[in-house]
Amino acid sequence: MDVVLKTENGRFNFRVCGIIMNGGKLLAMHDENSPYYYLPGGRVKLHERVEDAILRELKEELDISAEIIRPLWVNQAFFVEEVSKDKFHEICFYFLIDTSKCALLKRGEKFTRKDGKHTLTFEWLNIEELKDKYLYPEFIKKEIFNLPEYPILTTESRAEL
């Protein structure tokens, strides 16, 4: 069971995301319902360690067995999701991921994968051009240039809730 709480006032999500970089590019994704890019990852399951959750999500979404280098950020976000219009309070752990032992780069600059009923499109985005991309969370556009050695708590609020 995913750690999600739905109420009449909004939703709470407990998530993990992977920061996968190569040659000055960041791997981002979107699906057929989202006009914006976001990072690979997903919801943490009840009683699941965040480290296990990110590796599971990367296996599910990308079919890779990756390794965690280190945690980077814990971000608390408050926003209204643009497609569903739901109000969210989200806690997300971001991990720097090593995919050097995977054949991920052989898939090309842009590739798709099926995830149940959804088609996920993955794309390597040049980090120098992120400021012009429709990418969430927005703090990544700036902080990607200064990856912390130790986890940092960040807060991002995109809307008055």
Residue ranges and their predicted role:
Residues 22-60:
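Conserved Nudix-box catalytic region and its N-terminal flanking loop in Nudix hydrolases
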Residues 1-17:
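Acidic, metal-coordinating catalytic segment for phosphate/diphosphate chemistry
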Residues 8-12, 85-91, 114-119:
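A generic structural micro-feature
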Residues 65-74:
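A short coil-to-beta-strand element that immediately follows conserved catalytic motifs
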Residues 20, 96-98, 123-126:
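Short, well-ordered beta-strand micro-motif
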Residues 35-37, 103-105, 110-161:
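Nudix hydrolase/Nudix homology domain
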Residues 79-107, 143:
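Active-site-adjacent beta-strand/loop module that shapes the phosphate/pyrophosphate-binding cleft
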Residues 24-26, 34, 45, 74-79, ...:
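Short, charged/polar surface micro-motifs in flexible loops or helix N-caps
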